Amino acid sequence: MALGKKVLQKPPLSLANELHKDTGKMPYFLLQARHIANTLITGWHRQRKSGNGENFWQFRPYMEGESITRIDWRRSARDENTYLREHEWQTTQTVWLCPDQSASMHYCSRFSKISKGNHAIILTLTLASLLARSGEHIAIPNLMSPTMTSNVVERIAFALENHSDENSFPDFSTITRFSHVIIMSDFLDYPEKIIQHLTVLTTKQVTAHLIEISDPAEESFPYTGHTEFLDPETKEKHVSTKAEDLRKSYCKLYHARRQELVNFCARQGWSYHVSTTDQPLTETIFHLANTMSDSPLHKRRAL
């Protein structure tokens, strides 16, 4: 579902096709993703912290008393510190990337320069670039099986460019057990319906990371006066002559929906993070780096 605009400039059918048409900008999205990934890698290298791109989340400092056979001498030679390769990351993992491309994701208010869908695509390509340098298998449900190739980012871009899906979520039944699953969506639906879609993942012993893509207008509901609201997926319309009167109730329901999803994720040992389209993607990527390295799946694999 998308929020309102003062005047509806395009018919519903054109709204539904907007996000798919934006994929013509895929070369620009690839360029942006590479720039973000390279900036992060350069920053990690400059700070001399473990996880500098080639070994994303893979190393930690050596502690006295630990076996020297686990020291990674190549990584340690880069600076004055000594690093161990984490045992759990010696086994390649599969990370499933799930960017929502449904009609509501095309929404972009005047408070942002990019739609939710394009924000999700750039995030997907950036994560793929970083994960590929880590040697992880990367996959997209219904589009690309787990793979680890040098051109995986380009393959993902091509797959997304030639794919249009009205559904917010893919077929999760194809996801392999003991994987990481990163789901990028606006999650604008009844929470119980979303949870029903996600239930299949709870049986697969995966660790899911839900990234809620949000437009600034969806957070604050800045609308006033006569406003028409359109749901681009159901085509349902609502006209308000005094939109500001809806703000309090809207914000209450909007944040209650989010909190219910946060609580569900917490019970599963999953993570939930909000990524607004007017903010840099780096914060979201740092969040994923921390939560994936601290996840129960990560710790179980160390046993």
For the regions a language model picked out, list residue spans one by one.
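Exposed, interaction-prone extracellular/peripheral surfaces
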Residues: 2-48, 56, 61-69, 75, ...
